[in-house]
C-alpha cells in the first residue's frame, strides 16, 4: 500500500531557478498533451457543414483574393514564381506563425479555469497550441505540394526548388520557437494588463504587412527600408521558405542566422516570463 501511495503521489514544489523546465514531468503528462491536441483539432470546425474541409478552403480563398487584388489589380511581382504557389506558400507560413502567436498569447487567460482546478505542467498549453497549428500547416503544405505538382506536370512555369527544401522542418522549428517565445511573453504580460490582449489582433495584422508574405522582399529597393524590414525576424524565414521551395526570395545566411538568434532569445525569454508568471497569475486573472 505504501509503495502504491508513493507511486500515485505527486509533490508540487516551487522552483527557485528562473527557467526550471522539468522535461521528465512534461513527458509524464504526454497523454494529457495529446488529449488537448486532439480536442483542439476536433473543436476547430465542430458543428460545421464542411468540417475539416475548412483547413483547405480558408487558404484557397485567401490566395484567390491576393491573386486578384495584389497580383491582378496592384500588379505586384512574385519574383517569377507562379502567383498561386507564391501566395499559397506565404499564406501557409504566415497563418502558422499568426495562429501560434495568438493561441499562445492567450494561454493563461483562456485556461485560467482549468489551471485553477487541476495540476499539470502549465507549459503544456503553449506546446499544445504550437502542435495543433502544426497540423493545419501540414494540410496547407500538402495543398501546396499538390498545386506544385500540377504546375510541374503541365510545364506552364519554371519552378526551381533547391536542396534547401530538406531544411524546411528546421525552418518550421525556428518559426515555432519564435512564435511560442513571443506568445509566452505576451501571455505573461496580459495576466495584469488586458489592454495588450485587445491589441494583439491589430499588432499581428500590421506585422503581416511588414513581412514579405504577399510581396517579394526584392520589391523593396530602398536600402534603409530593406534593412529595417530584414530586422523583422520573420522576414528572413519567409524569404528562406520561398528560396527553398520555389527558388526565389532574397536568401541570406547572415540574416537567417540573425533570425535564429532572435528566435532562441525570444524563446528563452518567453520561458523565463512564463515560468515566473505561472506561480501567481491566478491571483490577477
Language-model region placement:
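Hydrophobic transmembrane alpha-helices and immediately adjacent juxtamembrane helices
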Residues: 1-285
Amino acid at each position: 500500500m505504501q509503495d502504491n501511495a508513493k507511486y500515485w503521489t505527486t509533490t508540487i514544489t516551487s522552483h527557485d531557478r528562473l527557467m526550471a523546465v522539468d522535461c521528465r514531468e512534461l513527458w509524464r503528462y504526454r497523454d494529457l498533451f495529446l488529449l488537448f491536441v486532439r480536442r483542439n483539432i476536433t473543436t476547430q470546425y465542430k458543428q460545421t457543414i464542411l468540417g475539416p474541409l475548412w483547413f483547405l478552403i480558408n487558404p484557397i480563398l485567401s490566395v484567390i483574393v491576393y491573386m486578384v487584388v495584389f497580383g491582378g489589380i496592384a500588379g505586384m511581382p512574385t519574383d517569377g514564381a507562379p502567383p498561386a504557389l507564391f501566395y499559397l506558400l506565404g499564406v501557409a507560413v504566415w497563418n502558422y506563425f499568426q495562429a501560434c502567436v495568438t493561441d499562445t498569447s492567450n494561454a493563461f487567460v483562456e485556461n485560467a479555469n482549468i489551471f485553477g482546478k487541476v495540476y499539470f505542467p502549465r507549459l503544456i498549453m503553449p506546446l499544445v497550441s504550437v502542435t495543433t497549428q502544426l497540423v493545419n500547416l501540414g494540410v496547407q503544405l500538402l495543398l501546396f505540394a499538390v498545386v506544385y505538382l500540377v504546375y510541374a506536370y503541365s510545364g506552364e512555369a519554371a519552378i526551381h526548388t533547391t536542396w534547401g527544401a530538406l531544411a524546411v522542418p528546421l525552418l518550421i522549428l525556428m518559426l515555432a520557437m519564435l512564435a511560442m517565445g513571443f506568445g509566452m511573453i505576451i501571455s505573461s504580460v496580459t495576466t495584469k494588463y488586458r489592454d495588450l490582449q485587445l491589441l494583439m489582433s491589430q499588432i499581428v495584422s500590421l506585422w503581416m504587412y511588414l513581412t514579405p508574405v504577399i510581396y517579394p522582399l526584392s520589391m523593396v529597393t530602398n536600402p534603409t527600408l530593406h534593412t529595417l524590414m530584414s530586422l523583422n525576424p520573420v522576414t528572413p524565414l519567409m524569404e528562406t521558405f520561398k528560396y527553398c521551395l520555389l527558388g526565389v526570395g532574397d536568401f541570406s545566411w547572415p540574416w537567417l542566422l540573425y533570425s535564429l538568434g532572435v528566435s532562441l532569445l525570444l524563446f528563452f525569454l518567453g520561458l523565463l516570463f512564463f515560468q515566473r508568471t505561472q506561480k501567481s497569475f491566478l491571483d490577477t486573472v
